């Protein structure tokens, strides 16, 4: 599995990286702009991400805008709902506006920090990934 973590907080990024590394190759981005560039490069290399974990509150380009840009790029590439990356929004913000904005931008899941490994893996399994308990 190829995974991208987009998280501006170093500690949160490190924790997610540690949790997800056993599942496959993990790349990290510190903001939404870096995340979009990573996704674009992955397409250019014909190795798109299977899973993307996007924080909502990030500098330069936030997670919602990055999500919209990624989904737009996937649509341009002709990817269907089944073949595009699974994108899970991860945030400290649980208010309805952020949840609705992420849902309207076609995220696949939503987790509120702090992220426990079991909750993260349960969410990943919901999207068809066969990962260990």
What annotation goes with each model-predicted range?
Residues 58:
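Receiver (REC) domain active-site loop signature in two-component systems and cognate sites
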């Amino acid at each position: 599995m190829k995974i991208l973590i987009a998280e501006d907080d170093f500690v949160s990024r490190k924790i997610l990286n540690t949790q997800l590394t056993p599942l496959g190759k993990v790349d990290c981005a510190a903001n939404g702009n870096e995340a979009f560039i990573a996704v674009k490069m992955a397409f250019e290399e014909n190795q798109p991400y299977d899973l993307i974990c996007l924080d909502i509150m990030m500098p330069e380009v936030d997670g919602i805008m990055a999500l919209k840009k990624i989904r737009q790029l996937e649509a341009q590439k002709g990817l269907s709902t089944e073949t595009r990356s699974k994108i899970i929004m991860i945030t400290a913000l649980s208010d309805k506006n952020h949840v609705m904005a992420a849902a309207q931008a076609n995220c696949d899941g939503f987790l509120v920090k702090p992220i426990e490994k079991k909750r993260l893996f349960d969410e990943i399994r919901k999207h068809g990934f066969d990962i260990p308990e």
